Amino acid sequence: MKPCFQINSKKLEKELLFRDEEDYIYGVNTLALILLQFPGVVVYAFTLMSNHIHLLLGGPREQCEAYYDAVMHRLSLWLKRKYGLSGVVPYGPENREVVVVKGVDHFVIEVLYLLRNPFKAKICYPGDYPWSSVGMYFSRRGQWVGRKASTFTARELRRMLKTNVRIPGHWEIAENGRSFLTL
């Protein structure tokens, strides 16, 4: 088993990372797009909450932390572009919590911790929360089916994913532009 780390952003007190569906879709897509820059990192689980994120990552610690910082940096650019907010998304060592996962039992506990966040916050049951990886493990497959990226034109992908990054053709993309991480 690769070294694993649960990395959380600190909760924003006055602003939100995600205000609407478009923001959440952008966040999920960011997790996938930034992963292309870090081939040594694996995303095992994630939960995007309105004011913070949780990631369970595998790989060398430095790469996992760099991946997290790149995700947060891209989200900060999004908030600046969409809402005119600067400096809202703090990233870097002092603005994240890193838990070293020690063994398989601890790994399972961390996955459950991440996926229970929406329930703990009294939003909904974990299986009903669309902005986490829970559906990758425990869903009715039909709700997660998208089209292969290779079936979209480059222009359609740019519009939906808000990036010029070349997307692997096997990635699944929903009609609303949400990509699906292959976990």
Tell me the role of every PLM-derived stretch:
Residues 1-45, 49-50, 58-183:
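Short Pro-Cys-Gly-centered "Cys-loop" motif that presents a nucleophilic cysteine in a tight turn
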